[in-house]
Amino acid sequence: AFERYDGCHGPGNLNAYACTKRAIELAKQNTIGCVALANTNHWMRPGNYGLMAVEQNCIGIFWTNTVPNMPPWGGRDARLGNNPITLAIPHSDTPVLVDVAMSMFSYGKLEVYKRSGRPLPVDGGLNKDQQPTKNAAEILETHESYPIGYWKGSGLSLALDLIAAALAGGRTTRQVGELPLETELSQVFICIDLDSLPDKENIAANVEATLRDMETSTPVEEGRPVHFPGAHMAEVRSDNMENGIPVEEAIWQQVLAL
């Protein structure tokens, strides 16, 4: 089942919440539900929508396009968006949750490195001299991040952008870049209801076995075992619920200065 909505320039997180909820409803009725959204704004933390899906025993696949902020592979100026995608898969109390942008580092992560003054672990993009750099501040200045997997991330970014704009009847990244602000984005919300499938118990068993097998991989660094995507997030969430949410010192000082 497929539905298309106009976000009417509304708050991105509220629009995304409503579309995720509707995609889940469609999935419960039809096994697969797809909702496409045009003319919306930044959806904030897409992992939350993945958690909404898995709470209803649905697989969730969500993505958005963005303003141009990444050069295509072989290019030197921004033509692609880093078009974040979230994939969520139910698994006991700790779902598999892949929440990634198509750039080496999300712009939120670049801000964290900029405030800390630490270099990135690998080159993350181009500086104003069009040279590779590990300096997050320089990448934030140019808005020219490297795509993940280099040419592969470049291709994925393009495909996600074109599919989102086509399904939503909305703007492509190129067209978003023509606006004075990052707005009128195109987004897709897909949910698949595992309860509708005849072998849902076998699916759950396969997920469990695959994750356990993955975690038995010999770690590169002793004392740092392999975790599946989403496991660390669950640990951090549990700690935050018990001990509170940590705030960077620089940000906390800004709060105190208000």
Each language-model region and where it sits:
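Phosphate/diphosphate-binding glycine-rich loops and adjacent basic-rich segments that engage nucleotide
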Residues: 70-137
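Active-site cofactor/substrate anionic-group-binding motifs, chiefly glycine-
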Residues: 1-24
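General beta-strand structural signal in soluble alpha/beta enzymes
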Residues: 5-7, 34-39, 60-64, 89, ...
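Catalytic-core signal marking the mid-to-C-terminal active-site face
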Residues: 167, 175-258
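Glycine-rich, mobile lid/loop segments that gate access to catalytic sites or pores
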Residues: 43-81, 85, 93
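A glycine-rich phosphate/pyrophosphate-binding beta-strand-loop-alpha-helix module
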Residues: 17-21, 25-63
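Secondary-shell segments that build the walls of catalytic and ion/ligand-binding clefts
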Residues: 118-176
